[in-house]
C-alpha cells in the first residue's frame, strides 16, 4: 500500500499545483494582447533583418573563400 501511495502522491501534488495555476491565470484583455502581438511582430522583424544582414555580409566572404580555389 505504501508503494502505491509513493507513486500517487507526486501525481496528486502535480494535479493540485496545476489546478492552482489554472485558477490564477487570466485571459488577457484587448490592450494587453495587442501589446504582446506588436512586440512579437517587432521581434520577428528585427530577427529577420539581422539574418538578412548576416547573410548579406557572408555571401561575399564565402565567394572569396570558394572562388580562390
UniProtKB/Swiss-Prot annotation:
Keyword Transmembrane helix recorded: yes
Extracellular side: 62-69
The organism of origin for this protein: Arabidopsis thaliana
Domain of life: Eukaryota
GO biological process: intracellular protein transport; protein targeting
Bilayer disposition of the protein: Single-pass membrane protein
Protein's UniProt name: Protein transport protein Sec61 subunit gamma-3
PTM annotation (N-acetylmethionine): residues: 1
Keywords: Acetylation, Endoplasmic reticulum, Membrane, Protein transport, Translocation, Transmembrane, Transmembrane helix, Transport
Compartment(s) where it occurs, according to its Swiss-Prot or TrEMBL record: Endoplasmic reticulum membrane
Entry's family note: Belongs to the SecE/SEC61-gamma family.
Keyword Mitochondrion part of the UniProt annotation: no
Transmembrane segments: 33-61
Annotated Pfam families: SecE (PF00584)
Gene behind this protein: SEC61G3
Cytoplasmic side: 1-32
MF GO annotations: protein transmembrane transporter activity
Oligomer status and interactors: Heterotrimeric complex composed of SEC61-alpha, SEC61-beta and SEC61-gamma.
Gene Ontology cellular-component annotations: endoplasmic reticulum membrane; plasma membrane
SUPFAM superfamilies assigned to the protein according to its UniProt record, in alphabetical order: Preprotein translocase SecE subunit
Record's function text: Necessary for protein translocation in the endoplasmic reticulum.
Amino acid at each position: 500500500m505504501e508503494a502505491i501511495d509513493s507513486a500517487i502522491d507526486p501525481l496528486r501534488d502535480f494535479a493540485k499545483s496545476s489546478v492552482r495555476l489554472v485558477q490564477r491565470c487570466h485571459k488577457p484583455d484587448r490592450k494587453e494582447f495587442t501589446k504582446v502581438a506588436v512586440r512579437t511582430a517587432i521581434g520577428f522583424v528585427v530577427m529577420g533583418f539581422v539574418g538578412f544582414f548576416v547573410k548579406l555580409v557572408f555571401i561575399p566572404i564565402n565567394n572569396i573563400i570558394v572562388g580562390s580555389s
